[in-house]
Amino acid sequence: MQYRDLGGSEIPASIVGLGTYLAGSGNNDGEYITAINKALDHGVTLIDTAPSYGWGHSEKVVGQAIKGRRDDVVIATKCGLWWHDERGSPIGEKDGKDVRLSLRPDTIRIEVEDSLRRLDIETIDLLQCHKPAVEPELTPIEETMACLAALKEEGKVRAIGISNVSIEQLDRYRVAGELASHQCRYSMLFRAPENDVLPYCAEHNVASICYMSLEQGLLTGKVGPDRIFNAGDWRANAEQWLPWFRRENRQKLLDMFAGWQDLLEHHDCTIAQLVIAWTAAQPGATHILCGLRTADQGIEAAGAAAILLSESDVQRISSDLTALGNPVTEQLGG
């Protein structure tokens, strides 16, 4: 297992972390708790959750999973998505709840106390603003950061992070306080952060915690062109907004993976592990989140962090990705 500090916080965390969105479903809590513990047994320390994942249920599951192992884990949760009253800016409805964005100090403090209770811990290692504030209730970044800094002083939070912000907002957050991390989508198939966010974070010692690095299973090698998703699976219509899910593009991915067979054998790894290792080797991409449902997936995620790719391995994979092209811009190779 490899570990890297969360920016300037001096909090070491495994380069592979567990994304626990699915733990919010309420299905098979016991299996999920076992999966988390298997990953911890294999060296994973970073666990990412949020109050909005199952409206608190994910945090409860994580809290149960880490009982007796608090010193083994780095708990990252979030604030900002608010559904308890009319404070904040409306952003939509989900599961019958009116969801709002609120980064005002009073709602942040309520969220922190609720998260501490659900997780059954005394301190949140990394508290992240889930999304940037929006109109009409546009809480100034400086006001939000002052609240988060106060929570650090009170010992309720160890480090401050943000997620899903623009490069301009990222700079304002960093200038306004001690910023440890930024969470963003980044993968082999979504490399826009390489143009701004990742270089900025690398320059200013801010950790980049990357999610969707396996692109909802597309980068595991297990989603072929003939795969049909169940009606209840959102991926059934994913190609409308994620062109890589088109049948012809899934085949292009499988063809690329087939060319990596010698790498898989040399590193004794799966396609998913190789993909994660390449992602973690990119400049600025310090930590990679992996979703999981089963114990085997937890073990597989942990194993990815043990893979050390050579510079030639990284360059070879990068060249293959360049040749693959980008269906978003309709620039596809071969």
Where are these regions (language model features)?
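Active-site groove signature of glycoside hydrolases
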Residues: 116-135
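N-terminal binding-site loop/beta-alpha segment at the start of enzyme catalytic domains
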Residues: 1-77, 81-83
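Structural motif
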Residues: 38, 42, 118-119, 155, ...
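Short, acidic/polar
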Residues: 27-39, 104-118, 166-171
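Beta/alpha (TIM)-barrel catalytic core signal, keyed to glycine-rich beta->alpha loops juxtaposed to Asp/Glu
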Residues: 132-324, 331
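Structural motif corresponding to the early beta-alpha repeats
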Residues: 72-102
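Active-site mouth loops of central-metabolism enzymes
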Residues: 19-30, 93-109, 135-137
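Residues at the N-termini of beta-strands
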Residues: 15, 46, 123-126, 159, ...
